[in-house]
Amino acid sequence: MNKDELLKDYQEIFGEAGKDVFFSPGRINVIGEHTDYNGGHVFPAAISLGVYGVYGPRTDNKVRLYSGNVDGDIVEFDLNDDSVEKDDRFWANYFKGVITYLRQREDGEKINHGFNLYVKADLPSGSGLSSSAAIEMLMGMILKDEFDLDVDRPSLARMGQKTENEFVGLNSGIMDQFACKIGRAHVWT
């Protein structure tokens, strides 16, 4: 996937230029699949496939999400809505959960305006390469960087796990989020 294509897609969807492009990797796991949430040992690594996001700030409080991998419309909600509801477009809940939980932090008031976000993955959904964790870590990284949040990578990983467990309602350990957020080239996590 190339940056120019992503920026072009963003422009076509939102009618304006995107500001920044982000990437969050997926992960493989050599041993220990389905054992991390039972306290077992795992051996994951980040990979070169993942989820890309093009961010653009807004002057209002609307968050507008669009996935290049799912047929459908723009998902839109207001940051000022105290109870962000789960969406019937399941993929959007990973973004909504991270936004909700980061806004609840002490410095969450820094997330003080809306944004447009175009996402596209080269990870096959349901392939076991942690597309959901990559989405969560992408959203966390974007909010951290664009709103100057004081949150470290392990805390973002835990926020992603909380999103998956509590907001989305899936049972997961912390392995996927840690591998996607802390992993880097040529290093096993």
Where are these regions (language model features)?
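Conserved small/polar residues in nucleotide/adenosyl-binding loops
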Residues: 185-189
